[in-house]
Amino acid sequence: MKDPNGVVIYEGTSQLDNETPIIVIMTGLEIASSNDKTGDMIQTWVILKDTPPHVAIKTGEDSAICGDCKYRGVYNMDTGVWDEERPCYVTVHQAPLAVYRAYHRGNYPAVTPKQVRHLIKEHRTGAVRVGSYGDPMAVPVGIWENLLKNSKRHTGYSHQWEIQRDAKAWQPIVMASADTELEAELAAKLGYRYFRVMPDTLQNKSIEVLCPASVEAGRKSQCAKCGLCAGTASHARKSVAIVQH
């Protein structure tokens, strides 16, 4: 029997609403990601346990894994159209839906925290993408702390940083996702490094660096090799900015 490409690392309640059952699936163990920007990274998918992701974005149930992220959009179930367009870059009927279906087919075995650490240690690159879909803060912070013990590099982003009480624990795990200069300033005051989406290339060069994997930066690196977006764990002084497309 072949080793699985994915495993279940969490089955429990969303930390965003404290009631909705969610799961976290770790994939990319055997098959490398084909994402040119990120490179070969272990992927982690935060999804609802009982509702397919392409359905959840329309019913609004995705709030249990995405919180109040403005990129969710608003779907009108009565008219069957989006009242507010969904600008999120994740195409949920592709990878997230495939992962959801594979989970319900029983393709992903559940693993212990010790096994998770071993899988990370033995991985080709040891690079982890925290929250390939879904906000990491929907998951208990201890799940990520364990996951990252043996990682070589990681990326992580959250739009829920303003409401998270245990900021000190999260700051080494995620970048605060900022959509305005004001949000970026607030995130920095709270102790987060941030990842700011900006309308042009006018980043504040004294405190921000242009994402090395972006087109504007000449695609100098990939996320799997870079390590800048690892929150305060990266020990980088500057935060990161990228041009919105």
What kind of feature is each model-predicted range?
Residues 1-245:
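Class I S-adenosyl-L-methionine
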